[in-house]
Amino acid sequence: EPSEAMIETMYEAIPYDSYDRVIAVGGGAIMDLCKLLGCKRPTSVHELYFKREPVVHEKEVIAIPTTCGTGSEVTNISVAIVKDEKDGKLTGGDTKLGLVSDDIIPNKVCLVPDLLKTLPYKPFAASAIDALIHATESFLSPHRKTVTSEMFSVKAMEMILEGFRRIALEGPDARMDYLGEFVHASLFAGIAFLKAGCATVHGMSFPLGGTYHVPHGESNYALFGKILEMYDEYEPAGELGKFKEIVARCLGCTKEDALRTLNVTLEKVLHLK
């Protein structure tokens, strides 16, 4: 995860007047760092993340993702672990915060599926599950969901679930013929949660990343199944009912068995410790 100290070091190493544009090639952390390089330099990273300094886009950012999970190439958020504070005073601990502003959305995106060929399987699987969670949470959003976000979230879920179905049946190498779909699905999920936001899974996973430095995709995955079960106990119909219909259609099961089948499939894709 990017950290406050890492960002400060980056600012010191790369003078602001030494470049005209930023080309971000990497995973979500690289995207988040490079999105900041496209903005006016703050006097303090800490003040920036605690929203006491404005975010001002000034330089072109071209995003080229090498993972298929964060969707950071199309989102308006940059996440970092920063020094925590309470009532304006440092606590001595760290916290994970998202800097949200449309000024940090990259100007252009270039998707190159072949870049995923050398991505090790575990980070591939964790990032793809993260993309599925982005799509799911934006689809289930009760207040912010729009026609546009639903279109992108449904397509992302369908593409990712089909890829996971293949991996569950044929093994990890099955992903190699489906990398284009995975990288596009990640972008679609990013657009969906740019519009509709994320929810409980991401809200609860942030402390795991900030305090224990658990990788983002893995911390989300650890919470995903149980939170869906809680949703199902609280309100099994409505948007969750529609979500279960999508899962059932994609994974070839009944609507009643959708959440269990999803958990079984995800366990085959990536063992949850």
Where on the chain are the PLM-derived regions?
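C-terminal and late-domain segments of enzyme folds
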Residues: 121-188
